[in-house]
C-alpha cells in the first residue's frame, strides 16, 4: 500500500514538473544528426478570403524547432513556408520529390500542414486550402488524394504526414466556413500507399480546435508534448496512442466537443507502429527563447541596373512568359 501511495506521489510530482515546462521553449537537444530526413512544413494562418487560423504559424515554427533540435534534422533539409499559396505548396512538395528521387530508400520524408481544410460538397473529397484559396471553390486548393498519390509514389523508406486541419468545412474556432452552409460535411478519407502514414487532427466530420492557453492547435500541442517528454525516442505507435488520448480527453473538457485524431496507413500494415521518430533520445534539454512567427516580407523592388531576385513564383512567371512568346512566334 505504501509503495502504491509513493508511486502515485512521484507520478503526480513528475506531471507537475512537466506541466511547468513550456513545449515552445524547453526543448530536448539531440547531438546525433539525422541527415537523411527531409521535411516540408506549411503553416497557413493569414488567409486572403477566409478567416485566420489561430496559432498556425506558431504550430509550424515550433514543429520545425523540434525537427532540428530534438530529431537532429539539418535546417537545410527543411522547407518551412509561412502562409503558402498553392504555387508555394506545389513548389516545395516538388522539391521533396526531387530530393527523395535522388536519395531513394536512404530518405525519410516528413510533411506537416497547419491551416484550413475544406471538403468538396459534391465529391466529398478533402482539400488543403492555400492562403489564396476560396472555401467556395475547394479545387483552388490541394486535394489530399493528389497529395497522398504524389507522396506514396516516392521511394522513401518512410513518409510521415501530419495534418492539423479538419475537412468538415468548419474553422478552428468551431463555426462554419462560407461554403459549408452551417452543416458539417464528412469528407472521404483518401487512400494512402507506399511506406506512408498520415496523422490527422480530427475525423472527417469534426473540427480541429485550438488550445488557446498554449497558443497551438490542440493536435499539434500534444504532438509536440510527446516529442518533448520522450526526448524524441518515441515510436509512431506510442505517439499515436498518446496524441489520440490527450486530444480526445482535452477537447471534451475544454471545448465540450469531440475531436478524435486518426491515423491512416496502407491496408493490412501495422509495422509502422514500430517506426521511431528519432533513433536515440536526446540527452539534454535547453531553455530557448519564444519564437515570434512572422511572414517573410517581399523583397523590395530592385534598382533598374540590377536583376530582380528569382523566387519560385518569378521563375514560373518567366517560364510561362517565354513559353507564351514562343507559341506566338511558332503557332501550330
Regions found by a protein language model. Give the residues of each.
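Cysteine endopeptidase catalytic domains of the caspase/legumain-like
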Residues: 7, 18-332
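Sec-dependent N-terminal signal peptides
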Residues: 4-13
Amino acid at each position: 500500500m505504501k509503495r502504491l501511495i509513493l508511486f502515485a506521489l512521484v507520478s503526480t510530482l513528475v506531471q507537475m514538473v512537466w506541466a511547468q515546462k513550456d513545449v515552445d521553449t524547453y526543448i530536448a537537444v539531440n547531438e546525433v544528426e539525422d541527415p537523411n530526413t527531409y521535411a516540408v512544413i506549411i503553416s497557413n494562418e493569414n488567409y486572403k478570403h477566409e478567416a485566420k487560423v489561430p496559432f498556425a504559424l506558431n504550430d509550424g515554427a515550433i514543429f520545425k524547432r523540434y525537427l532540428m533540435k530534438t530529431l537532429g534534422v539539418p535546417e537545410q533539409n527543411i522547407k518551412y513556408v509561412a502562409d503558402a499559396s498553392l504555387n508555394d505548396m506545389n513548389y516545395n512538395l516538388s522539391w521533396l520529390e526531387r530530393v527523395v528521387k535522388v536519395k531513394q530508400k536512404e530518405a525519410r520524408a516528413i510533411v506537416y500542414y497547419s491551416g484550413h481544410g475544406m471538403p468538396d460538397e459534391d465529391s466529398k473529397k478533402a482539400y488543403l486550402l492555400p492562403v489564396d484559396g476560396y472555401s467556395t471553390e475547394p479545387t483552388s486548393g490541394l486535394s489530399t488524394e493528389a497529395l497522398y498519390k504524389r507522396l506514396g509514389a516516392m521511394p522513401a523508406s518512410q513518409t510521415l504526414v501530419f495534418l492539423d486541419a479538419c475537412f468538415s468545412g468548419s474553422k478552428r474556432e468551431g463555426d462554419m466556413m462560407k461554403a459549408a452552409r452551417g452543416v458539417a460535411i464528412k469528407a472521404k478519407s483518401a487512400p494512402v500507399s507506399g511506406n506512408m502514414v498520415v496523422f490527422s487532427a480530427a475525423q472527417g466530420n469534426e473540427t480541429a480546435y485550438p488550445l488557446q492557453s498554449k497558443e497551438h492547435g490542440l493536435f499539434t500541442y500534444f504532438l509536440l508534448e510527446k516529442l518533448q517528454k520522450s526526448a524524441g525516442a518515441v515510436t509512431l505507435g506510442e505517439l499515436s496512442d498518446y496524441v489520440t488520448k490527450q486530444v480526445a480527453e482535452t477537447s471534451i473538457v475544454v471545448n465540450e466537443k469531440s475531436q478524435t485524431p486518426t491515423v491512416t496507413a496502407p491496408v493490412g500494415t501495422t509495422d509502422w507502429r514500430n517506426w521511431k521518430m528519432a533513433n536515440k533520445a536526446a540527452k539534454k534539454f535547453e531553455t530557448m527563447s519564444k519564437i515570434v512567427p512572422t511572414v517573410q516580407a517581399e523583397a523590395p523592388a530592385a534598382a533598374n541596373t540590377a536583376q530582380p531576385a528569382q523566387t519560385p513564383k518569378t521563375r514560373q512567371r518567366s517560364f510561362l512568359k517565354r513559353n507564351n512568346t514562343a507559341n506566338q512566334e511558332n503557332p501550330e
